[in-house]
Amino acid sequence: MGFALERFAEAVDPALECKLCGQVLEEPLCTPCGHVFCASCLLPWAVRRRRCPLQCQPLAPGELYRVLPLRSLIQKLRVQCDYRARGCGHSVRLHELEAHVEHCDFGPARRLRSRGGCASGLGGGEVPARGGCGPTPRAGRGGGARGGPPGGRWGRGRGPGPRVLAWRRREKALLAQLWALQGEVQLTARRYQEKFTQYMAHVRNFVGDLGGGHRRDGEHKPFTIVLERENDTLGFNIIGGRPNQNNQEGTSTEGIYVSKILENGPADRADGLEIHDKIMEVNGKDLSKATHEEAVEAFRNAKEPIVVQVLRRTPLSRPAYGMASEVQLMNASTQTDITFEHIMALAKLRPPTPPVPDICPFLLSDSCHSLHPMEHEFYEDNEYISSLPADADRTEDFEYEEVELCRVSSQEKLGLTVCYRTDDEEDTGIYVSEVDPNSIAAKDGRIREGDRILQINGEDVQNREEAVALLSNDECKRIVLLVARPEIQLDEGWLEDERNEFLEELNLEMLEEEHNEAMQPTANEVEQPKKQEEEEGTTDTATSSSNNHEKDSGVGRTDESLRNDESSEQENAAEDPNSTSLKSKRDLGQSQDTLGSVELQYNESLVSGEYIDSDCIGNPDEDCERFRQLLELKCKIRNHGEYDLYYSSSTIECNQGEQEGVEHELQLLNEELRNIELECQNIMQAHRLQKVTDQYGDIWTLHDGGFRNYNTSIDMQRGKLDDIMEHPEKSDKDSSSAYNTAESCRSTPLTVDRSPDSSLPRVINLTNKKNLRSTMAATQSSSGQSSKESTSTKAKTTEQGCSAESKEKVLEGSKLPDQEKAVSEHIPYLSPYHSSSYRYANIPAHARHYQSYMQLIQQKSAVEYAQSQLSLVSMCKESQKCSEPKMEWKVKIRSDGTRYITKRPVRDRILKERALKIKEERSGMTTDDDTMSEMKMGRYWSKEERKQHLVRAKEQRRRREFMMRSRLECLKESPQSGSEGKKEINIIELSHKKMMKKRNKKILDNWMTIQELMTHGAKSPDGTRVHNAFLSVTTV
């Protein structure tokens, strides 16, 4: 305790006051942070709290030091005498006070002498009387009984005795104790006054609650919580507060709320605080309308025990896991000195809960008070949030929902397929791309495709690694997801209504267009100028290729949503092969996409009305009715369980232990997709063959010569694309346009490549291409095409079927003029890879934004002629099973970084395996030249090249034999070296025999093939062995 301010004769500078006791510093001690306190106040605080009283930094008693200059300054201040109440008016310096008190005339002993009384000490039983200074009758022998003088025998010149001094010291000690007790009484009275104020406030709250009527579940209830600091922290965070002076937009949602509670902290008890508690008072200080800074200071300065009065909202339905389910809104928060962790309050929302704004955690220092405080408001059951902070405008377009998924065991899958975006660097969120229909998430029903996952179990998720780690945690059986979705996202019911209306209008327009086309037989002549321009544009190879690519990218991106729609239908439907409804959708969806991606394109004939006439010219009313039914069927299929938006990205399996099962499912899907695709293609090809044959048989007979040239060129091109075994690099290059088309459209048509000329569908495919080219050539008769070379071969081919077609293919192997070949290679609707993009450019205006225009017509034909072609389908399926190549799923990466899944033939893998096998067979048994040659390592030699190798080997063998014979003749002709020659010959023969033994042993040990053994062990006509024959490679 310091010196009381009342004792000083002059005003004291506030800098000389102690912050703990509020009095003038006595024996000042300074902390390492520069704060000065009284020694008697600071030492107990440092021992017990281990922290500076101003909460700035930790503190230890050994770190304190005295401030001697400050002590000297305080000692020079003038104070009043301790006996001022007795009449002493002197004021002396503080360091002279003790000497003055000892000799003050107003002290107890001095007062006796000044009244003329006896100056002797009080000894024995002598006690001075009230009326005079003489001794009582019990006085000593020198008393006044003998009539002596008042001084008695002590004498006048004597001072006070030792007893007098002892009594004086005793009196001073008692006075000091009395002053200390008075100070404690004052502090106790102040403390009880504060408690009384708190209790009165509680009583007023209770009275107000009781007077407000019966309490309903869901209202606020007051709670009183007593807290004590542990390690200088209370273990919870607060947010909110009344707007400060910088923010004049004050609302009724003021208040201080608990945002987070530290685990195992002082506030984390059964009777402690809970998240979203509204703090009303702290040690009697009202905080209901306080700012955030005032609340922080109140908790800092609060003395233990800290009594906190809170209002707590009781939920209508308490979840089983015992956590609060209140709504928490936060715009900005400031970290207080209560804890040092991030401030984050999660909103526990029930399924019907309205959207809430984004939850943005902040970690700010105490000096950062410029942010707007949090505005909080509680709502009843079905009320919507009407007042949002000004800073939350950017989050008004999103809807937030917290979903809890519980699983019985860790092996049970949640059923969520999540993906992350790579095309936008700013957006690094995790999105739900698919929900398994029979999973936990699907049964819950609150998570939709396209939802963004913000938090998992209260932890922010920024990348896929964090999401996989949290979702695949085996120990966690309860997963709480905070998801966000656009609030303006179209409702599924509204989409269905709009789609139905659009399809009705489209149906009427298409039927009207078909009728008009059927009634105008001269429509072909109207379309001729346009086709001539396109034909001229495709004459130049460079111009044609560039234009095709431009059309492909532009149209693909224009109708990107439609392409995504159809690709997502197929891929989503293929996920559940056991479902009947999904299987039916997959059947029709596959027919759509595959039929639209094969080489049987008829865009020009569709625009000119030729194909439409062939379908509807017989019975328009009946065909229109069937067409309308097909439209309705397609709408139902599209609206039942399919989704318009598909997020094309790489998926992340939540359960990483089932990779093998996924691969097995993909293999089954591949087989099923192939069967469905082949079946639909065969039906459509047979139908088009029959339909177009009936309508345009006379045209084929007139223009057969030109058609044969077109067909031959395309067949040769297809042969190059299919016979890809000898040129694996060229296959990727030639087929790149198909995948480029898929890239621009963000989807991949699921087509299956077939080997050429080995099955009935291949023959039908070629025939149908000729038919379509015949219609194209018929409309281009004005472009200089000659019709004098026409024959009746085409009609005979159509009548005789597949056998005649195979014969005609042999005749069509003749050479082509360069000009016709170039034209045929670059016609857009004859290209199997640019057909899907070129199709959009020639669709009528009323159907340009609806990609399934042509696919509906294909479906109509497929359904109409399905039953009549069952036998043909069975034959095609049997022939396709033995001829179709194996396909596999590939994950491809586009130029912008996005990924997509497509099916590629496994020919590359087969070629690699063949090369490795050849390399293994040739290892250790080839010649030195072949071993060192990099060009021949792993290369596959074709049949023609192997024939050339044999010819070269024979030529080399003849050359060596000739050289050997000439050498022997030279040796025989020289008699002078006869003996030496024989010796040399013997040495050569012996060395040859030795080498052949080693070589044969080596060859047999290294598993040399029979052909190579025969080649290396061959003998020349004169009996000598040939050792360096050219290596012959066996066929794998």
UniProtKB/Swiss-Prot annotation:
Highest taxon of the lineage: Eukaryota
InterPro entries: E3_ubiquitin-PDZ_ligase, PDZ, PDZ_sf, Znf_RING, Znf_RING/FYVE/PHD, Znf_RING_CS
Biased composition (Polar residues): 736-750
Pfam families linked to this entry: PDZ (PF00595), zf-C3HC4_2 (PF13923)
Coiled-coil spans in chain: 655-689
PDZ domain residues: 224-314, 402-486
Gene3D superfamilies from the UniProt entry: 2.30.42.10, Zinc/RING finger domain, C3HC4 (zinc finger) (3.30.40.10)
A single GO molecular function term of this UniProt record: zinc ion binding
Designated name of the protein: PDZ domain-containing RING finger protein 4
Keyword ATP-binding (UniProt): no
Bilayer-crossing regions: none
CDD domains per UniProt: PDZ1-PDZRN4-like, PDZ2-PDZRN4-like, RING-HC_LNX4
Biased composition (Low complexity): 774-799
SUPFAM superfamilies: PDZ domain-like, RING/U-box, TRAF domain-like
Organism: Homo sapiens (Human)
RING-type Zn finger ranges: 18-56
Region (Disordered): 129-161, 515-590, 726-819
Record keywords: Coiled coil, Metal-binding, Repeat, Zinc, Zinc-finger
Compositional bias segments (type: Gly residues): 129-160
Compositionally biased region (Basic and acidic residues): 548-566, 726-735, 805-819
